[in-house]
């Protein structure tokens, strides 16, 4: 291509987090200023840009493929095949980039992930979801050490699994030493390990003082799953400064746009207790967004962040959810940073049948009732038959008291679900977002999700990553699994539930607008006049099965990512 010129909450915490919407609104007007300084600032990136000579899949319902897209002040003003017509939309000559035939799609929307957790990781977090051997791991870590100061931890916490490596194991202490002789390294799988470290990391972990140390590390660098991994992760978290978290937020955003993911509906975290029992999915729910908001306030935000608020109040006396609903606002912010709903939990998951009268079920119903009465969107998490039955039956009970059919309540993940419950959810105005987390460690008897059944049913359906604890964030790895049914071990486990490549990208773009809701639905996910100019230009032609085989889908990334007409990633 070429171109021309983290404790329990006090009321103060709750009010602070409730004011997050206001913080988002306050930060966002500055957020676009740096990226769009040449265009007078504004509330979000607002660039002038023409992309020409591309295979640009607009993803509108007629699915035209065009060669030219023009973006003025951050909004698309022309799609078609005439550059001369595009140029008429501008008073001053815009920047123009020749895509040289490259395939482009709308900026990817991930409607369920944990990018805020990723940005709050300790150390220099280094995604390994694109590594397929120990040698790849070493190469990735070695590259990261060129950025990390000597002595700083290079870490990977979640988002990968040794099943994806040719050797089907984690790297050893010696192998990590070879990759990073001057940096401690810590790699941890999933929520609670197992983990591995190198010599410098071993020395650090074995010297952690009590009561939460030391960490037991094997001669080969291995750290057992559970308490020992919990101690290790905690020791690293206790070293985090706010500046570290700001750097992590920037790194997370840079990684996302390198994949072409421009919009993220973040689904929160479990409330951290500053204890070894905290896993990779724990953080301070009342402060975790602040590093991101600070970065946006600096004008360095390069993704669109949508924020759901996760609630797991097991104590009947807890006022957290009620205070949230009283002190925050849904869908509040601007095109760059905006609040969403309650999710991916409204309370601990109920048990089937929801009408059992158990204390847990009563608490869940009361929480859902509060959300419905406040007219908020809700998203819940289903990993089993018990989960989806109790939750969808619970939705129906709540709907009889406070109608939810226009609120778009969502069930997420669904490695399994029966079509009668899909129909029941659809009748309640709900939707389902699916994730391919079974790719890492699924088996023929524990596969899913039922992509094909859901797509054919007609319920609002979206694709998400749930990255990055137990799943990769990379949408192209998820597209690989959704279109092949093959897991990381190379075993076909979900072959009767496949999507086409076109369907997978539609779910990651246009269809995911439904899950954002509000004004976003008509502004994102499609390249058409009046919509925001978010584009991902790919390194491979995703749609050409002849030239890009199934295995190559996992190698797709973005060579050029545009947010509101501003180039936020350029790897040409």
For each feature predicted by the language model, list its residue ranges:
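N-terminal secretory signal peptides
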Residues: 1-10, 24
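Twin-arginine (Tat) signal peptide motif
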Residues: 6-15, 33
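Divalent metal-binding segments
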Residues: 17, 39-52, 57, 61-323, ...
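Sec-dependent signal peptide hydrophobic core
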Residues: 18-23
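C-terminal region of N-terminal signal peptides and the immediate post-cleavage residues
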Residues: 24-43, 540-543
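Acidic (Asp/Glu)-rich catalytic clusters
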Residues: 326-337, 402-404, 425-427
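Non-cysteine beta-strand/loop elements that form the S-adenosyl-L-methionine
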Residues: 334-347, 430-438
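His/Asp/Glu-enriched, well-ordered alpha-helical/loop segment
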Residues: 369-409, 413-415, 419, 423, ...
């Amino acid at each position: 291509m070429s171109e021309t010129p983290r404790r329990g909450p006090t009321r103060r915490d709750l009010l602070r987090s409730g004011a997050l919407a206001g913080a988002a609104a306050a930060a966002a007007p500055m957020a676009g200023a740096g990226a769009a300084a040449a265009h007078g600032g504004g509330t979000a990136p607002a660039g002038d840009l023409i992309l020409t000579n591309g295979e640009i899949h607009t993803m509108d319902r007629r699915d035209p493929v065009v060669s030219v897209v023009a973006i003025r002040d951050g909004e698309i003003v022309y799609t078609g095949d005439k550059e001369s017509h595009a140029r008429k939309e501008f008073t001053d000559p815009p920047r123009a980039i020749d895509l040289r035939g490259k395939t482009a799609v709308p900026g990817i929307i991930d409607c369920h992930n944990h990018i805020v957790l990723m940005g709050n990781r300790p150390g220099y977090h280094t995604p390994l979801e694109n590594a397929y051997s120990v040698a790849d791991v070493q190469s990735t870590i070695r590259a990261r050490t060129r950025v990390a100061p000597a002595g700083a931890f290079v870490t990977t916490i979640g988002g990968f699994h040794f099943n994806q490596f040719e050797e089907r194991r984690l790297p050893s202490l010696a192998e990590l030493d070879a990759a990073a002789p001057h940096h401690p390294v810590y790699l941890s799988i999933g929520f609670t390990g197992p983990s591995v470290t190198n010599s410098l990391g071993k020395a650090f972990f074995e010297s952690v003082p009590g009561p939460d140390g030391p960490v037991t590390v094997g001669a080969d660098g291995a750290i057992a799953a559970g308490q020992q991994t919990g101690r290790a992760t905690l020791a690293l978290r206790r070293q985090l400064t706010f500046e570290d978290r700001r750097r992590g937020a920037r790194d997370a955003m840079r990684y996302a746009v390198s994949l072409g993911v421009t919009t993220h509906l973040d689904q929160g975290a479990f409330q951290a207790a500053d204890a070894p029992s905290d896993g990779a999915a724990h953080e301070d729910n009342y402060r975790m967004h602040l590093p991101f908001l600070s970065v946006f306030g600096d004008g360095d935000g390069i993704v669109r962040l949508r924020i759901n608020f996760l609630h797991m109040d097991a104590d009947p006396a807890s006022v957290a959810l009620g205070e949230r609903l009283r002190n925050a606002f849904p869908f509040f912010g601007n095109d760059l940073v905006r609040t969403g709903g309650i999710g991916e939990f409204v309370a601990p998951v109920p048990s089937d049948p929801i009408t059992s009268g158990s204390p847990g079920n009563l608490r869940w119903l009361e929480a859902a009732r509060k959300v419905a009465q406040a007219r908020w969107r809700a998203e819940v998490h289903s990993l089993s038959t018990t989960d989806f039955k109790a939750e969808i039956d619970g939705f129906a009970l709540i709907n009889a008291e406070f109608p939810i059919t226009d609120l778009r309540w969502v069930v997420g993940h669904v490695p399994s679900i029966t079509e009668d419950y899909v129909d029941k959810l659809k009748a309640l105005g709900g939707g389902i977002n699916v994730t391919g987390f079974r790719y890492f460690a699924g088996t023929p008897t524990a596969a899913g999700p039922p992509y094909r059944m859901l797509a054919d049913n007609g319920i609002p359906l979206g694709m998400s990553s749930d990255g990055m604890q137990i799943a990769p964030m990379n949408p192209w790895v998820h597209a690989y699994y959704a279109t092949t049914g093959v897991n990381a071990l190379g075993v076909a486990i979900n072959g009767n539930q496949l999507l086409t490549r076109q369907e997978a990208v539609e779910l990651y773009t246009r269809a995911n607008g439904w899950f954002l809701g509000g004004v976003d639905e008509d502004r994102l996910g499609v390249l058409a006049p009046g919509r925001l100019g978010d584009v991902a230009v790919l390194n491979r032609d995703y749609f050409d099965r002849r030239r890009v085989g199934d295995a190559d889908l996992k190698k797709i990334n973005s060579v050029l990512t545009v947010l509101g007409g501003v180039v936020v990633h350029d790897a040409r």
